[in-house]
Design a protein with these regions (language model features):
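Short, low-complexity, intrinsically disordered N-terminal peptides in bacterial proteins
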Residues: 1-6, 165-166
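Structural signal for conserved beta-strand scaffold positions within catalytic alpha/beta enzyme cores
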Residues: 8-9, 141
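Acetyl-CoA-dependent GNAT
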Residues: 12-93, 104-106, 110, 145, ...
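Conserved phosphate-binding and hydrolysis motifs of nucleotide-dependent enzymes
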Residues: 64, 68, 98-100, 138
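Conserved glycine-rich acetyl-CoA-binding loop
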Residues: 78, 87, 91-105, 113-114, ...
Length: 166
């Protein structure tokens, strides 16, 4: 059965939607994130709303069900990055249907107007599946592994992707 994927930018009034998908992600894939379910489950409405002040949150839905998420933060980053992408996750029930490709397509359509032309991200060095998925989207590894400040003993790899207009 074909899937209808819809990508939207969430706004602060949709903080519950962000919270719900983020907590699902932390329960499903705790190894993939710097944060923890235990800590983020304790955040109140004000703390969730504050996150919207510094980051743009994107959610992809499949036939009306929130199935993937990411955030984008504008910054002057390593290797010329104009933004940093993080918090990428897709629901295991919907993996393989093109959610990440759809969300990066959503970003690319706005890249010029929002200064998202050179996208950077960090991925744990032991997350081979995510690294391969990002490479399929055009990301390349840059620099060597970096020590995590949020999870001592873990290392992440920086990856960069330039959009067609960069």
């Amino acid at each position: 059965m074909p899937h209808t994927i819809t990508c939207v930018e969430l706004h602060a009034d949709e903080w519950v939607r962000l919270r719900d998908i983020r907590l699902r992600a932390l329960l499903d894939s705790p190894h993939a994130f710097g944060g923890t379910y235990e800590k983020e489950n304790q955040l109140d409405e004000q703390q969730w709303r504050l996150d919207f002040a510094k980051q743009t949150h994107i959610v992809a839905s499949v036939n009306g069900i929130d199935a993937a998420m990411m955030y984008v933060e504008n910054l002057e980053g390593d290797f010329g990055a104009t933004c940093w992408v993080g918090g990428c996750w897709s629901d295991p029930d919907f993996r393989g249907v093109g959610l990440m490709r759809a969300m990066f397509g959503f970003l690319d359509k706005q890249a010029e107007s929002r200064d998202w032309l050179v996208q950077g991200l960090g991925v744990w060095t032991d997350n081979d599946l995510a690294i391969a998925a990002y490479e399929k989207l055009g990301f390349i590894e840059m620099g060597g592994p970096q020590a995590s400040t949020r999870q001592p003993g873990k290392f992440y790899q920086r990856m960069i992707r330039k959009t067609a207009r960069a």
